[in-house]
Amino acid sequence: MEFLTNEKLTIVGAAGMIGSNMAQTAIMMHLTPNICLYDPYGPGLEGVAEEMLHCGFEGLNLTYTSDIKEALTGAKYIVSSGGAARKAGMTREDLLKGNAAIAEEFGKNVKAYCPDVKHVVVIFNPADITGLITLAALDSTRLRSELAKHFHISPDKVENCRTYGGHGEQMAVYASTAKVDGKPLLEIIGTPALTAEQWAEIQSKVTKGGANIINLRGRSSF
């Protein structure tokens, strides 16, 4: 059986409905054989793992743990649905206080245990806010895209781009973690390959990326 990658994928909140379905979907799509399931609720987590193992998926290396350090260490991809569920009578905003704290703690754990993770997906509500609290994934991808265009290389050769803050012109666009074709971006900025002025222009394009798309298309969504 061929997989898209052999790198580790961690599913956070795997004992829940969304998390367990994400685990099954990842396995059936042959994303990677190396999948780790994490949830603080041990019995439910073990039940999900047993159910997946009983399916007899070929080539699957499935592990599970309630230790967040063990779950995240070595992970290159993470999907997190590890927030509280919305109950009857609750609004999305009612979830914010508790789930924002969960998202903040999750972000700190990612930084501590797998700082070289390639992609993080946050899908617990209110997802538009919890996702931003954890990692500004869309804006980080925009930074990678702009750097790839500038250097005329594949986006796959631009790694570890990071942006933080709100989804607008007040966001912070960092160079400290990024690498371009294996070379730290900080070592390139200020050279003829990427002058300080060009870097400032790229930062501006990233923070105004959404507005630019709207100007070009006349609308924001498909």
Please provide the spans of the model-predicted regions.
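Conserved N-terminal Rossmann-fold NAD(P) cofactor-binding segment
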Residues: 6, 31-76, 84-86, 90-91
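Conserved glycine-rich cofactor-binding loop
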Residues: 15
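Redox-cofactor binding/interface segments in oxidoreductases and associated redox assembly factors
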Residues: 79-80, 122
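N-terminal Rossmann-fold NAD(P) dinucleotide-binding loop
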Residues: 19-20
